Amino acid sequence: MARLSEPSPYVEFDRTQWRALRMSTPLKLTEDELKKLRGLGEKLDLLEVEEVYLPLARLIHLQVAARQRLFAATSEFLGEPQQNPDRPVPFIIGVAGSVAVGKSTTARVLQALLARWGNHARVDLVTTDGFLYPNAELGRRNIMHRKGFPESYDRRALMRFVTAVKSGADYACAPVYSHLLYDIVPGEKQVIRHPDILILEGLNVLQTGPALMVSDLFDFSVYVDARLEDIEGWYISRFLTMRSTAFADPASHFHHYATLTDEQAVFAARDIWHSINRPNLIENILPTRPRATLVLRKDADHAINRLRLRKL
């Protein structure tokens, strides 16, 4: 652990220090399973899972148990019946970070690892993309160009959803977003029923405000971080690759990008980055980083080599 010259709410680790905290936590993920979890352009391997994600999964596992003891103590104080061990209060994890930084991969890997623990096997993952306003509503509000910014989300609906899950509702429904259509899928819902753990992944999940926010319901949060220049490079690289994958589908909203030359594609990607994604990152996403329980810092090669844990 890093020695800090002044008192700080954070503890900083390099990868060697962090991996020692894995203790004897077993790796129950195969290479084939990891391939299905890895995002486009990601270079995550089993070694990084062992050295970075297993210690993180162990930390969360310990915090889940501690949180349940805290809920039990509160119930005892209030004279309420002890909670049903088969229906514990769901543990909510937020995963935040920029477009193209790899937060979706982080969320999927955490889901896979945490679900392999017997006492919290029900782990659900929901992305906040489903809580974007439909394109028609964004157009009505004249904020289509601000898609992904905080005002483009139905934050009340998101708050109702997470509150329902946390409160033990029989089920809670999240809208479904299609990246192919670049819009909400009408009538389609993701139904969440009594999870032990809910992972909520999205750009703005750590946002604060004068009223109760979804981040106030988190028990743990992760911010995936990197240099702005590196994230821009990853975004452009992913855009180039998608010309022959997602964009190639005639049904894709972005099918018109599929035939761009490399030079044209780089120009288009850089324009989108500097007009939308970079401003959103600087104005709205990056300022929430200090609120995260854990910051995962990536180097230019995507490898996580530095971590910062909030201890207070």
Curated annotation (Swiss-Prot):
It is found in: Cytoplasm. It holds the Pfam family PRK. It catalyses: (R)-pantothenate + ATP = (R)-4'-phosphopantothenate + ADP + H(+). Its EC number is 2.7.1.33. Pathway: Cofactor biosynthesis; coenzyme A biosynthesis; CoA from (R)-pantothenate: step 1/5. The keyword Kinase applies. Disulfide bonds: none annotated. GO terms for biological process: coenzyme A biosynthetic process. GO terms for cellular component: cytoplasm. CDD domains: PanK. ATP binds at G97, S98, V99, A100, V101, G102, K103, S104. It comes from the Bacteria. It is an enzyme of class 2 (transferase). HAMAP family: Pantothen_kinase_1. Belongs to the prokaryotic pantothenate kinase family. This is Pantothenate kinase. It comes from Mycobacterium sp. (strain KMS).
